[in-house]
């Protein structure tokens, strides 16, 4: 992926130097993704509950558990972080790339919204290491993977997740991993689009009315597959705006990553069996299918997972 000419967004809060937690006495919170502690092995297990990446899992999963008496509603908090925070486009290589990806995502979606007579305000991205305050979505932890917090319109992202995708998920290799990062961020931005369009609130209400956890999970799968499709829409529009930004192997890397974090793949790796009723993000085949649908068609209308047999 060529991104040198991407517009860098300033809607980034860089907490990577915060010390990995809330501060206070002792060493604070530390949840390393590699080595000891919680890593991708934990994510694979948590993936059974939808913790690969997507909407803040405490919102949708918590909602599903409430239906069956298995959990409590998520607690939203005011943001009480400590430690240094930087705002604006980061200058390090990883941070600058993320700022560029967000800038281009915002520009393309702004064009789409304007063409339909609507205004667009982009999401904010919070970069962190290990753990941080997730605002009204509670604690953000590395083991949860990247997620979007609807009430704050914010994407939370520990950039070490991208290394894990390459080294443990084997979702990409070499320069193609840059585009995998773009796919992941575009997926999270897809949830922001759903939020702006009122899809997330409507699905939340439907989940509350669902008669079973399996039914609630099925709704969540449609949300996640639609976000995959919307990420493909962005790639389509970006390619038209900046021909040549994609390089050989980029699309294949995104598809490999989508397959690697499919619910069936994660469940098979974690337990050796697949339970479709417990899916929360969709199968490997579904995730690839809907990303490619968005990429080929380039329209929001093509991403109707709720009526498209997802």
Set out the residue ranges of the language-model regions:
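Active-site recognition of the HExxH zinc-binding catalytic motif
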Residues: 48, 109, 157, 183-196, ...
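Post-HEXXH active-site segment of zinc metalloproteases
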Residues: 195-220, 224
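Secretory-pathway/luminal and periplasmic proteins that interact with or process carbohydrate-rich
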Residues: 132-138, 192, 260-269
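Short helix/loop segments within enzyme catalytic domains
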Residues: 96-120, 217-266
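Pan-zinc metallopeptidase signature
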Residues: 259-310
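Soluble non-cytosolic domains of exported or imported proteins
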Residues: 88-103, 172-184, 214-225, 245-249, ...
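Peri-catalytic and regulatory segments of divalent metal-dependent proteins
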Residues: 74-182, 194-197
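Long amphipathic alpha-helical segments used for membrane anchoring, targeting, substrate engagement
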Residues: 1-86
